[in-house]
């Protein structure tokens, strides 16, 4: 019984650490998105993809 409790406690501890690291990584990604240069790069990517999609529709006649 004691080893079962120890195992569950270890799993709980490791799960807590995993959630903490995931939250830190998510926060870091959000900070990068808040960077104006990063936002400009994302907008440029979308603009290029939209332009390519429009050209494809134009040439394919759809």
Curated annotation (Swiss-Prot):
The keyword Secreted applies. One of its GO terms (cellular component) is extracellular region. GO terms for biological process: defense response to fungus; defense response to Gram-negative bacterium; defense response to Gram-positive bacterium; killing of cells of another organism. Pfam families: FSAP_sig_propep. Its main location: secreted. The modification Leucine amide is found at residue 60. Residues 1-22 form the signal peptide. It is found in: Secreted. Expressed by the skin glands. Residues 23-44 form a propeptide. The keyword Cell cycle does not apply. Has antimicrobial activity against some Gram-positive bacteria and fungi but has no activity against a range of Gram-negative bacteria except P.faecalis. Active against the Gram-positive bacteria S.aureus ATCC 25923 (MIC=37.5 uM), S.carnosus KHS (MIC=37.5 uM), B.licheniformis X39 (MIC=19 uM), R.rhodochrous X15 (MIC=4.8 uM), is virtually inactive against E.faecalis 981 (MIC=150 uM) and inactive against E.faecium 091299. Has some antimicrobial activity against the Gram-negative bacterium P.faecalis X29 (MIC=75 uM) and is inactive against E.coli, P.aeruginosa and S.typhi. Belongs to the frog skin active peptide (FSAP) family. Temporin subfamily. This is Temporin-HN1. It comes from Odorrana hainanensis (Odor frog).
């Amino acid at each position: 019984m004691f080893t079962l409790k120890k195992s569950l406690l270890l799993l709980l501890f490791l799960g807590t650490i995993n959630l903490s690291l995931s939250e830190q990584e998510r926060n870091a990604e959000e900070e990068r998105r808040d960077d104006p240069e990063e936002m400009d790069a994302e907008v440029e990517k979308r603009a290029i993809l939209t332009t390519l999609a429009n050209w494809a529709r134009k040439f394919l006649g759809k």
